[in-house]
């Protein structure tokens, strides 16, 4: 029987009232009695402080301020201490008889916050003779002692042999030691556990039913099923880890894709740039050589063009000099032709205008006579019409206003006065003072006759004037002709000069007739002279081109020599053309073949790369397609063998997994049906009862029970009989054993133990011999040992399976690679190397190009000679027909003589042309120049006087006519007669009006008709005058212009001038054409020279730049090559198939890869920076650095424990295989890890059933507890309805909710929470997450409802509440609950500590006087039965006959307070022993 640990004593050092006091504690009840302020609460506060040194929990309520809403700052501890170092120590002895002193060092902290500093410590190995007070105090004299600080205490204890001192920095470590040594009943791992322990102590200290405990009885009484929860958590953690691993694999697969993408794009980016630089370097070298060849050729061409330019410039200067003379001659000929044409046109105009003027003169004279007659008739018609109009107006006015007619006398008086005025005017004009109205008519006839006579006289003078004017105009015309021909002269000299001019005109006309024959002769000679000059020019040009002077006699022989040379060169050129065509044809064939090979080369190179990779992977060399197919067959055989071995290993691994799963079942049941049957029968599996069997005892018990090791232990077999009827879902052999599962032992059988075997006597006539199994599986330790060995075997099998899977996938990938190679490259992989053939063809092409170049040079020289010979023959063909002209030396003298004679004839022709018409007009009228008509002015004066007389006579006749017309007005002197005859007057007026209107109409018609006719006559006259004046003026202008021209226009002049101009134009055109040809040729030559010069400078610059670039690039390229070889990436970068792409394609490829790489390395700062630096086109080595950095980056991410290679490309291939295998393995592992919902329900139900049985056992211990009217106390445990429904669904209807448990997105806890919400939609889950709710649902305690019930009087069983019980009953009931909690904690912790330790049990009860004697006796009995220590505080002694009683009295001595303590140890025959008193110390009431 294991003894229970006990608290031996409590020691207070330097507390208020207690300087150094040790209270020995009774094994059962220790009573502290005393009045108010005696120090009872201080003593228990010191005990609690040493037990739970947590300032966040300690709160002694009897020292709080009254009525305050918050506690005291020091929470009752600061005021209980004295200044300086204080101690509270507990002296204990545990079940192992080990003395352990635990305590705390306390010290007040200065400040108004009233804080206390606590340091927990423990002392082990202290001898029993040493008292706690001796450890922490030092005696100074008989009445003085000093409290040792903690460091001195430590030094003091370290000096003692075998004593261990431990100081703790955390309360958790302090409580952990106390738990391990059996001082406290429960392991306090966290602040929550400490809080529960403190609440329990606090509830016992102050008594009553603690609501804090009763509300959370599940947390206090029901142990946390940490194993089940840990199993669930491990399962979920494993599933979570599995899923995270799968997700990591998926991420790794994406990383693998990223790695592949990164390697692919980095290779494309760097290899494209690498090959582009390699191609550019080769191209630059070729260009440098080509520039050098072109430079040499261009220099030769420039020298040839310079020689050619000098020759053409000299010839052009000669043509420019000749062109100036030709232009002057041509311009003079053109001007002469224009003058001749102008003179001819002028002469034609003059003749046409003179004829028109004669005709207009006649028409003008006739029209003047017609107009004069029309004017006279017009005047008469106007007078007649005016009189008729006046009379009509007067009659109308009279008829329109009859009253006016009555007043006509006044009007007639006016008319009468007007008539008198007209009469007076006529008298004045006609000089007739005796003129009257009656005689006016007679005088009118007289004056009309006089007017007619004056008109006839004027007409006679006018006729004479016209005749005189005609004679005068002929003289003036002849005089003007003489002046026009000879110039200004006197009128009397005109006759002599005119006769001289007519004689000179005859001589000049004779000379003018010789112009045409002379001109024709001159034209012929000039033509021969020009041909002679052209022949001389052609001969000089020919000699200059030939570079030698030739005589005329040598030209024919030279002509024959040149024709023979042309025939020979023509044959050579023809043969050269055929040879050049053959060479070019061969060159084109070579180029076509090279292009074909260049197109085939990338395919062949890709096939070779693939073949090399296959060779590296398999370590074989392939020389033909047959080797490839044979190796593929070998691969298939190896794959088949590897798959068979992998499947065998996989089957064994699955068997091991199944065995591990079977052995991992809770309770050791290998058959799930046994768990269900045990729950159904209300029993426990035998394997679960013996679950704690050690590994050494496992073989014995396994052999002891034999086949019945999987039996079910039931309390009563008779109650199971009814369940066995119709039972089918069970193992073939089901063993049932009757017994108490709580106290089951192996006394069921009679056993004889042998060597490694047992003999079990089942019955008198039936024995069973069982050997100890080599691998026992009975008990948790044996199963764990077996599981451990199975796990080791599984690790080996898993590693072997992984290796085989890797090998299989590697072989499969190799097989796929061979299949791809056969499908894509086998047809071309073993063909001849196209690059070698390309190199041979390029060599031949260079030879052909060199031969073509030499052939072109030779052909060019022959063509130049051929062209020169053709030009010489052409020139000789033009020279030879003119040899006779070249021999004529007198041709130029004859031309000059004929030209002088032609000049004289042309001068005479110009005189005739200029004055021929004047002389022709002068000749018929030259006789009128003999006399000058001087009487012409007198005749003009007589004609003017006659006109004036005719006008005066006309005015006189008009004045008399007016008088005659107004004769009627003279009779208006008397108007009386008009007033008496009104009606007659009206009638007469009407008759007169009609007559007057008719007369007026006739006068108007006559006037209108004659006016229109007169207007037409005047218009015709004005038109004739205008035409005559215009033509006269134009004629004078034309005559002046003809004189200004100074050229005589005859019929042949224009033709001769045109012929001369055309000849000069032809010469000028030929000269200009040749000059233009030379200028164009010279310009072209200059342009060609400029182009050649620029080309030469450009070629020199390009050549030197290219050479410098080649030299510079060589250094950079050497650095790149050195970096490539040092890092071993040449095989990756030197991709020969890229050499056949253009620079633009490679740059585009690199740019595309760069864009992809920027996205790929966006999250990697190092690679991003290196990539940014590599973008510098002037530093190609940085791209190599980037490629190396990428490879290094990928190498660092290769797991060397899985992938054993440094090559990232190979690593990626191995990674694909490994990730595929891991994915498959983890998927199967997830399926095995997943626990079924039915298993969860069974585990929770089994746990609930076990705890219900345990609570039932606890209730048995409380059946006899009674306090007052309370006869019994018990705990009631029920399963919540909502949770019971959840368990039913999990076990029976889980198929309906597999959508939750099969979801990869939900953990089991989340799926359980979702199911709970689905079943109980009315419950508000608040802000809690499904994971939190699920974890709560995995804790069986949340399925139970617990409450405390009391059997009180006649009320029966009631819920234990403070309001329904008396104070004493509540204290007793609360104490019973606390005892149950402590006992439950011990049961829960039994598995965690050593089995040889039974922890201390101690509770408090302050103010115990509220209990009666019976209740006190019940407490004492309870403590005795449960081996529990109890500390009671009361004002008076309570049952001093039992336990130990301390009497505390606070006394004042010399202004100091101290507590006097007297201890009694029960009632005995001997006198009560007085315990040592306390030291004095100043204190305040506690």
Swiss-Prot record:
Plays a central role in chromosome condensation, segregation and cell cycle progression. Functions as a homodimer, which is essential for chromosome partition. Involved in negative DNA supercoiling in vivo, and by this means organize and compact chromosomes. May achieve or facilitate chromosome segregation by condensation DNA from both sides of a centrally located replisome during cell division. InterPro entries: MukB, MukB/SMC, MukB_hinge, MukB_hinge_sf, MukB_N_dom, P-loop_NTPase. Pfam families: MukB, MukB_hinge, SbcC_Walker_B. The gene is mukB. Belongs to the SMC family. MukB subfamily. GO terms for cellular component: cytoplasm; nucleoid. It is found in: Cytoplasm, Nucleoid. GO terms for biological process: cell division; chromosome condensation; chromosome segregation; DNA replication. Homodimerization via its hinge domain. Binds to DNA via its C-terminal region. Interacts, and probably forms a ternary complex, with MukE and MukF via its C-terminal region. The complex formation is stimulated by calcium or magnesium. Interacts with tubulin-related protein FtsZ. ATP binds at residues 34-41. The hinge domain, which separates the large intramolecular coiled coil regions, allows the homodimerization, forming a V-shaped homodimer. One of its GO terms (molecular function) is DNA binding. This is Chromosome partition protein MukB.
């Amino acid at each position: 029987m294991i003894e229970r640990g006990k608290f031996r004593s409590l020691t207070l050092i330097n507390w208020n009232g207690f300087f150094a006091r040790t209270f020995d504690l009774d094994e059962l009840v220790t009573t502290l009695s005393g009045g108010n302020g005696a120090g009872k609460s201080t003593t228990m506060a010191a005990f609690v402080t040493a037990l739970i040194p947590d300032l966040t929990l300690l709160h002694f309520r009897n020292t709080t301020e009254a009525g305050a809403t918050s506690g005291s700052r020091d929470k009752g501890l600061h005021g209980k201490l004295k200044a300086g170092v204080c101690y509270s120590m507990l002296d204990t002895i545990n079940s192992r008889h080990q003395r352990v002193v635990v305590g705390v060092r306390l010290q007040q902290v200065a400040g108004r916050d009233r804080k206390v500093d606590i340091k927990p410590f423990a002392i082990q190995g202290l001898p029993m003779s040493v008292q706690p007070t001796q450890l922490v105090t030092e005696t100074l004299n008989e009445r003085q002692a000093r409290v040792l600080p903690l460091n001195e205490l430590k030094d003091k204890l370290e000096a003692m042999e075998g004593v261990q001192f431990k100081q703790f920095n955390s309360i958790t470590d302090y409580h952990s030691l106390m738990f391990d040594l059996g001082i406290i009943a429960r392991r306090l791992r966290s602040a929550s556990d400490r809080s529960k322990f403190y609440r329990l102590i606090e509830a016992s200290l102050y008594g009553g039913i603690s609501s804090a405990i009763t509300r959370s009885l599940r947390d206090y009484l029901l142990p946390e099923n940490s194993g089940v929860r840990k199993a669930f958590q491990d399962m979920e953690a494993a599933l979570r880890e599995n899923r995270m691993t799968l997700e990591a694999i998926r991420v790794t697969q994406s990383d693998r894709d990223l790695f592949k993408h990164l390697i692919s794009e980095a290779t494309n980016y760097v290899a494209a740039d690498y090959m582009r630089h390699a191609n550019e370097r080769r191209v630059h070298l070729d260009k440098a050589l080509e520039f050098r060849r072109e430079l040499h050729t261009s220099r030769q061409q420039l020298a040839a063009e310079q020689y050619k330019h000098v020759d053409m410039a000299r010839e052009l200067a000669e043509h420019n000099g000749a062109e100036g003379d030709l232009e002057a001659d041509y311009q003079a000929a053109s001007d002469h032709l224009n003058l001749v044409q102008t003179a001819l046109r002028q002469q034609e105009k003059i003749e046409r205008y003179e004829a028109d003027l004669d005709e207009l003169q006649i028409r003008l004279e006739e029209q003047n006579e017609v107009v004069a007659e029309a004017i006279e008739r017009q005047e008469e018609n106007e007078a007649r019409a005016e009189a008729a109009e006046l009379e009509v107006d007067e009659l109308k006015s009279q008829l329109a206003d009859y009253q006016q007619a009555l007043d006509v006398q006044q009007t007639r008086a006016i008319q009468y006065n007007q008539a008198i005025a007209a009469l007076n005017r006529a008298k004045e004009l006609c000089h007739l003072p005796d003129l009257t109205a009656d005689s006016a008519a007679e005088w009118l006839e007289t004056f009309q006759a006089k007017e007619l006579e004056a008109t006839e006289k004027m007409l006679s003078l006018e006729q004479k004037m016209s005749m005189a004017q005609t004679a005068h105009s002929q003289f003036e015309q002849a005089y003007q002709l003489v002046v026009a021909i000879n110039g200004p002269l006197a009128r009397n000299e005109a006759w002599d000069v005119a006769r001289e001019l007519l004689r000179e005109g005859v001589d000049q006309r004779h000379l003018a007739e010789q112009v045409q024959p002379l001109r024709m002769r001159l034209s012929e000679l000039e033509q021969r002279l020009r041909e002679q000059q052209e022949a001389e020019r052609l001969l000089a040009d020919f000699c200059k081109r030939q570079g030698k002077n030739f005589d005329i006699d040598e030209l024919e022989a030279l002509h024959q020599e040149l024709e023979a040379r042309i025939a020979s060169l023509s044959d050579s050129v023809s043969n050269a053309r055929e040879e050049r065509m053959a060479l070019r044809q061969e060159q084109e064939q070579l180029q076509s073949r090279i292009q074909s090979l260049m197109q085939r080369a990338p395919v062949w190179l890709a096939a070779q790369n693939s073949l090399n990779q296959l060779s590296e992977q398999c370590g074989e060399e392939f020389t033909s397609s047959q080797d490839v197919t044979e190796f593929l067959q070998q691969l298939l055989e190896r794959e088949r063998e590897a798959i068979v071995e992998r499947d065998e290993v996989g089957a064994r691994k699955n068997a091991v997994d199944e065995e591990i799963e079977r052995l991992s079942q809770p309770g050791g049941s290998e058959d799930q049906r046994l768990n269900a049957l045990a729950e159904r029968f209300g029993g426990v599996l035998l394997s679960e009862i013996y679950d704690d069997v050690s590994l050494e005892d496992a073989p014995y018990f396994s052999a002891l029970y034999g086949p019945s090791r999987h039996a079910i232990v039931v309390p009563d077999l008779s109650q199971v009989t009814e369940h066995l009827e119709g039972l089918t879902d069970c193992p073939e052999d089901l063993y049932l054993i009757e017994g108490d599962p709580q106290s089951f032992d192996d006394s069921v059988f009679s056993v004889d133990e042998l060597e490694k075997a047992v003999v079990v006597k089942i019955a008198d006539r039936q024995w069973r011999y069982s050997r100890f199994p080599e691998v026992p599986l009975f008990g948790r330790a044996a199963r764990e040992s077996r599981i451990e060995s199975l796990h080791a075997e599984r690790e080996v099998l898993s590693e072997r399976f992984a290796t085989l899977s890797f090998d299989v996938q590697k072989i499969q990938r190799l097989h796929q690679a061979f299949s791809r190679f056969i499908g894509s490259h086998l047809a071309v992989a073993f063909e001849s190397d196209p690059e070698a053939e390309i190199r041979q063809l390029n060599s031949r092409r260079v030879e052909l190009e060199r031969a073509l170049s030499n052939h072109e040079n030779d052909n060019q020289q022959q063509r130049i000679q051929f062209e020169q010979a053709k030009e010489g023959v052409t020139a000789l063909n033009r020279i030879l027909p003119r040899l006779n002209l070249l021999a004529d030396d007198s041709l130029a003298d004859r031309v000059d003589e004929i030209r002088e004679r032609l000049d004289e004839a042309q001068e005479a022709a110009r005189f005739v042309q200029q004055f021929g018409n004047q002389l022709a007009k002068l000749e018929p009228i030259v006789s009128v120049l003999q006399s000058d008509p001087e009487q012409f002015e007198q005749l003009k004066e007589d004609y003017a006087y006659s006109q004036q007389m005719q006008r005066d006579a006309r005015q006189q006749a008009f004045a008399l006519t007016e008088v005659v017309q107004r004769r009627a007005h003279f009779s208006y002197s008397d108007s009386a007669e008009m007033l008496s005859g009104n009606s007659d007057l009206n009638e007469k007026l009407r008759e007169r009006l009609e007559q007057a209107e008719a007369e007026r109409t006739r006068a108007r018609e006559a006037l209108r008709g004659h006016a229109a006719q007169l207007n037409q006559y005047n218009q015709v006259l004005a038109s004739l005058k205008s035409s005559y004046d215009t033509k006269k003026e134009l004629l004078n202008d034309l005559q002046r212009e003809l004189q200004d021209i100074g050229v005589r226009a005859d019929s042949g002049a224009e033709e001769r001038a045109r012929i001369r101009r055309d000849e000069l134009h032809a010469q000028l055109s030929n000269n200009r054409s040749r000059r233009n040809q030379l200028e164009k040729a010279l310009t072209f030559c200059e342009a060609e020279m400029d182009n050649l010069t620029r080309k030469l400078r450009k070629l020199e610059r390009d050549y030197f730049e290219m050479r410098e670039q080649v030299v510079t690039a060589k250094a950079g390229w050497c650095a790149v090559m050195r970096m490539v070889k040092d890092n071993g990436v040449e095989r990756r970068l030197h991709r020969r198939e890229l050499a056949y792409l253009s620079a633009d394609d490679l740059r585009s490829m690199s740019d595309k890869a760069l864009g992809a790489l920027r996205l790929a390395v966006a999250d990697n700062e190092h690679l991003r920076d290196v990539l940014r630096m590599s973008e510098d086109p002037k530093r190609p080595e940085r791209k190599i650095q980037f490629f190396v950095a990428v490879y290094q980056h990928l190498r660092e991410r290769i797991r060397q424990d899985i992938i054993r290679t440094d090559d990232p490309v190979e690593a990626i291939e191995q990674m694909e295989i490994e990730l595929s295998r891991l994915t498959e393995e983890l998927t199967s592992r997830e399926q095995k890890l997943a626990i079924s919902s039915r298993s969860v329900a069974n585990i929770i139900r089994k746990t609930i059933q076990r705890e219900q049985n345990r609570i039932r056992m606890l209730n048995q211990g409380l059946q006899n507890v009674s306090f007052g009217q309370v006869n019994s106390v018990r705990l009631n445990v029920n399963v919540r309805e909502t949770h019971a429904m959840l368990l039913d669904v999990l076990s029976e209807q889980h198929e309906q909710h597999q959508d939750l448990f099969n979801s990869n997105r939900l953990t089991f806890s989340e799926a359980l929470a979702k199911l709970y919400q689905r079943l109980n939609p009315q419950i508000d889950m608040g802000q809690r997450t499904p994971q939190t709710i699920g974890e709560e649902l995995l804790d069986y305690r949340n399925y139970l409802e617990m409450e405390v019930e009391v059997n009180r009087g006649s009320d029966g069983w009631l819920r234990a509440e403070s309001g329904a019980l008396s104070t004493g009953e509540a204290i007793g009931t609360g104490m019973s609950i606390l005892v149950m909690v402590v006992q439950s904690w011990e049961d829960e912790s039994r598995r965690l500590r050593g089995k040889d330790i039974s922890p201390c049990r101690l509770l408090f009860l302050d103010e115990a006087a509220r209990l009666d004697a019976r209740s006190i006796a019940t407490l004492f009995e309870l403590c005795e039965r449960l081996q529990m220590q109890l500390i009671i505080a009361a004002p008076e002694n309570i049952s001093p006959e039992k336990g130990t009683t301390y009497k505390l009295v606070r006394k004042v001595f010399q202004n100091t307070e101290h507590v006097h303590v007297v201890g009694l140890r029960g009632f005995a025959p001997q006198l009560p022993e007085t315990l040592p008193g306390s030291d004095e110390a100043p204190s305040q009431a506690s």
